């Protein structure tokens, strides 16, 4: 007999119905819970799904450079801001240890005002350059910033007597340089450092940097060549240090890499050893000034000749570019003060500047009047009496004839800057004299032929001539004279 009671059919039916009801209830509860979970997830995730995900741009910061007292080779990587266009990698820079860092010597003398003042029509129609350069150039010195926008360049050209042909001629010249650059980044034969620096200045005058789409590789190669030379020569820059004229190469190259550093620093472009080369090369100029206040061949500090105006003018341009970098240099103020005193001794009563003392070279025409005038404009302002006297000489005696001569481009490289810095009638007269002649003389390949009667120490190399001509045509926008530039 079974120990369990047998359920009646009715009880069995009710039990089965109860089981089915429990299963259905459990399933419904599970479905409701799942639905609630899904709704909760949708509530959380749906807003993010409806918003377009932003584009994430990442870049790798450059590792800090380590000091190494041994000879080494560096494969420079150009780092830049995320928004910048791509550029080529720099060439290999062989670096060597620069001269030991000296302890800074504090200057206790009061620093004179080295900015431009207001001169005769100085800066008329130029604006103040303080409206922001855009495109990452906002912290570039205002005097240099306007060259970096095509619109600003054309505006400067239009407002100051230039035209679109000037811009076209400059671009043709830059393309000529691109085609003729050597594999090591240089131009020129026995004077590679000086010529490469002049060409680099022409590129920078058009705001071409290592990030430039068309000329970035060319510019990077030129900077790399000069930095490599500086590192190998422990702060000195020249093709031949045994040639007494190397003081020219050094100053022009220091000028060029200082200006390059100003752009690269603002654009977060890290070219190895560029900063160090700027510091050592500009400091060399300061530390090797002649006792006269000028600069001499081979940087002879004690030579009785005391230097000359031609050498000195390039050193002064390099010092101005060095100040624009924002880097620290020992005794810069005292150096510039003494140099300006030297320049005063070279100015004749008629306003011209001699080569050594007040004596001009050749036929007596002051081919260095623009150089001397520019030195005072850069470091004292166009209102300075020496600068005014120099401009009066330029107004009366400048000659520019590209077909028959005289046409000393070395003289006019300086005079074109001095004239536009002064502005007014002086610039209008000078611009009318040179602009169209220079444009019409350009060769189809973008170069310029050597002009007749080019003056003392004439050089007929097409790279040299083309670099000077290009810098003259960039004078409309290369610097803003109303805010203390001009180089």
Question: What do these predicted regions represent?
Answer:
Residues 1-2, 35:
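Strand-loop microenvironment adjacent to phosphate/nucleotide-handling motifs in alpha/beta enzyme folds
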Residues 2, 6, 10-12, 45-167, ...:
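Intrinsic-disorder/low-complexity signature in envelope-associated proteins
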Residues 16-39:
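Membrane interfacial helix-start segments of signal peptides and signal-anchor transmembrane helices
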Residues 18-22, 51-52, 169-171:
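Short hydrophobic/aromatic segments of transmembrane alpha-helices and their interfaces
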Residues 28-32, 306, 443:
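Alpha-helical architecture
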Residues 133-172, 186-218, 231-436, 447-485:
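An alpha-helical repeat/solenoid feature that recognizes helix-turn-helix modules
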């Amino acid at each position: 007999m079974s120990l369990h009671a047998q359920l009646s059919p009715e009880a069995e039916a009710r039990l089965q119905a109860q089981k089915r009801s429990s299963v259905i209830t459990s399933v419904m509860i599970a479905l409701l819970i799942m639905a609630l979970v899904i709704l909760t997830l949708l509530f959380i995730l749906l807003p993010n799904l409806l918003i377009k995900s932003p584009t994430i741009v990442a870049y790798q910061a450059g590792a800090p450079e380590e000091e190494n007292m041994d000879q080494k080779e560096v494969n420079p990587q150009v780092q830049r801001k995320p928004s910048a266009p791509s550029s080529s990698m720099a060439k290999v820079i062989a670096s060597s240890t620069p001269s030991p860092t000296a302890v800074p010597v504090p200057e206790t003398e009061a620093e004179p005002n080295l900015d431009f003042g207001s001169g005769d029509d100085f800066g008329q129609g130029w604006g103040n350059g303080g409206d922001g350069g855009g495109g990452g150039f906002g912290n570039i010195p205002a005097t240099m910033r306007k060259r970096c926008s095509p619109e600003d360049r054309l505006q400067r050209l239009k407002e100051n007597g230039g035209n679109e042909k000037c811009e076209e001629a400059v671009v043709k010249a830059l393309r000529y340089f691109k085609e003729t650059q050597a594999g090591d980044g240089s131009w020129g034969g026995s004077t590679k450092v000086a010529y490469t620096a002049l060409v680099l200045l022409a590129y920078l005058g058009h705001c071409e940097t290592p990030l430039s789409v068309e000329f970035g590789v060319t510019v990077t190669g030129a900077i790399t060549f000069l930095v490599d030379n500086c590192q190998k020569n422990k702060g000195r820059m020249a093709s031949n240090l045994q040639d007494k004229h190397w003081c020219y190469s050094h100053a022009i190259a220091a000028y060029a890499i200082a200006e390059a550093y100003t752009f690269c620093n603002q654009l977060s472009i890290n070219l190895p050893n560029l900063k160090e080369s700027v510091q050592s090369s500009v400091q060399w100029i300061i530390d090797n000034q002649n006792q006269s206040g000028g600069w001499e061949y081979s940087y002879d500090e004690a030579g009785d000749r005391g230097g000359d105006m031609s050498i000195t003018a390039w050193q002064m341009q390099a010092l101005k570019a060095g100040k624009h970098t924002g880097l620290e240099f020992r005794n810069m103020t005292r150096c510039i003060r003494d140099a300006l005193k030297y320049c005063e001794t070279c100015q004749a009563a008629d306003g011209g500047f001699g080569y050594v003392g007040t004596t001009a070279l050749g036929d007596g025409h002051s081919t260095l009047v623009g150089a001397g005038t520019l030195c005072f404009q850069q470091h004292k302002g166009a209102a300075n009496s020496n600068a005014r006297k120099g401009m009066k000489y330029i107004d009366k005696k400048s000659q520019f004839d590209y077909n028959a001569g005289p046409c000393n481009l070395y003289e006019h490289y300086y005079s074109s800057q001095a004239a536009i810095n002064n502005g007014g009638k002086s610039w209008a007269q000078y611009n009318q004299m040179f602009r169209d002649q220079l444009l019409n003389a350009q060769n189809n390949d973008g170069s310029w032929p050597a002009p007749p009667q080019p003056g003392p120490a004439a050089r007929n190399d097409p790279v040299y001539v083309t670099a000077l001509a290009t810098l003259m045509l960039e004078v409309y926008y290369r610097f803003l004279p109303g805010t203390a530039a001009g180089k």
